[in-house]
């Protein structure tokens, strides 16, 4: 199977120029599904820390590139929304955040913020033993005690080292959200109204912003965040 993908066919979330070359690297198996961006693209095209695959592999073999607290050696490992990237040798830390047009962008954060990551709950399932399994937006799962306060659509912050929930943001009117897809990707505002749609169609969400502006999008495209997640300057 080819390790390359045509640039014109890559997802909109990939931060690559589509007309500069015919092919780009293909994402390997891992979290985030089709929207995951290969780590090589982040190192080469976004940060400029490597000129090619060979240089990226050399850097990764030094074990000082971490994603969500774990050292990564695979340059094709997918990187996606709200992942935490740490470059320990450089003492640089980033959170992956939606940028304009839905392209993934890196927001600089401080070392303390890099100790945990945000996850949107997309599924909630009762498992044997009376516990609950939460499925997150990136495909990861988390077992928690049976707690009725967690619902699909909520967001949680999970510690990278111990996997414990350190914060919980409910999806409700008044919540601070960001759009991660669609025409308003990267925009931030407060949920003004959740319009419940009968049947299998998605609910609509009206989001208000400063100075009377706002936007409307589908529920799937919004993620509840804390104000610290819009940008953490060191």
From Swiss-Prot:
InterPro entries: Rib_uL2_dom2, Ribosomal_eS4, Ribosomal_eS4_central_region, Ribosomal_eS4_central_sf, Ribosomal_eS4_KOW, Ribosomal_eS4_N, Ribosomal_eS4_N_CS, S4_RNA-bd_sf. Pfam families: Ribosomal_S4e, RS4NT. It comes from the Archaea. Transmembrane segments: none annotated. Gene3D superfamilies: 2.30.30.30, 2.40.50.740, RNA-binding S4 domain. The keyword rRNA-binding applies. GO terms for cellular component: cytosolic small ribosomal subunit. GO terms for biological process: translation. Keywords: Ribonucleoprotein, Ribosomal protein, RNA-binding, rRNA-binding. One of its GO terms (molecular function) is structural constituent of ribosome. Residues 37-99 form the S4 RNA-binding domain. PROSITE patterns: RIBOSOMAL_S4E (PS00528), S4 (PS50889). Belongs to the eukaryotic ribosomal protein eS4 family. This is Small ribosomal subunit protein eS4. It comes from Haloarcula marismortui (strain ATCC 43049 / DSM 3752 / JCM 8966 / VKM B-1809) (Halobacterium marismortui).
């Amino acid at each position: 199977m080819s390790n390359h993908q045509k640039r014109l066919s890559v997802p909109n979330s990939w931060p690559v120029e589509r007309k500069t070359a015919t092919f780009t690297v293909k994402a390997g198996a891992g979290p985030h599904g089709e929207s995951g961006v290969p780590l090589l693209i982040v190192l080469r095209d976004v940060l400029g820390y490597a000129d090619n695959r060979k240089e990226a592999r050399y850097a990764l073999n030094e074990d000082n590139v971490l994603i969500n607290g774990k050292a990564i050696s695979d340059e094709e490992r997918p990187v996606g929304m709200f992942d935490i990237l740490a470059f320990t040798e450089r003492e640089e830390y980033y959170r992956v955040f939606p940028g304009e047009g839905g392209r993934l962008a890196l927001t600089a954060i401080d070392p303390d913020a890099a100790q945990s990551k945000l996850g949107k709950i997309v599924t909630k399932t009762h498992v044997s033993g009376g516990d609950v399994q939460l499925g997150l937006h990136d495909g990861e799962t988390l077992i928690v005690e049976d707690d009725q306060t967690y619902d699909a659509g909520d967001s949680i912050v999970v510690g990278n080292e111990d996997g414990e929930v350190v914060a919980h943001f409910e999806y409700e009117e008044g919540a601070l959200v960001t759009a991660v897809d669609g025409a308003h990707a990267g925009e931030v505002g407060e949920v003004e109204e959740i319009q419940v749609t009968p049947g299998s169609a998605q609910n609509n969400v009206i989001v208000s912003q400063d100075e009377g502006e706002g936007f409307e999008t589908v529920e799937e495209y919004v993620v509840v965040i804390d104000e610290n997640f819009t940008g953490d300057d060191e």
